[in-house]
Amino acid sequence: VKPFIDREYRTIPDAAHTGLGGASLGGIMAMHLGLRYPKTFGKLAVMSPSVWWDRGVILRSVKSLTAKTAQRIWLDVGTEEGRGMAENAKRLRDALTEKGWALDSDLYYFEDKRAGHEDSAWAMRSHKVLRFLFPATKVRG
């Protein structure tokens, strides 16, 4: 899909300008694909990730990394998502920091107070995700 998008639309195709994101199981898929293709996806939005999926395979994937990648990662969770979601998101955050990602630098962890596991909650914080992953830059002129 990415070659098609880069061919058909005006993009900056390098990893520094390419992001991938998702929520829930989509968040896990974004993290999985991002870790597998770090030279393609330099920015990852991992919202309310279903860390429990496949017996925590994403935690094992992060822990098995031989080196930290040069990716910028947004990780978040709502405190009212239930089923241990917040605790699992913290486990993923901790696994990433153990591999070298630095909180508030190339990894941002956000707990949305009173937010549930739903589209409306993700929509309400999506602007924060985009501001972190794609910060404003000065235009020379």
What are these regions (language model features)?
Residues K2-G141:
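Non-catalytic cap/lid and distal C-terminal segments of serine-dependent acyl enzymes
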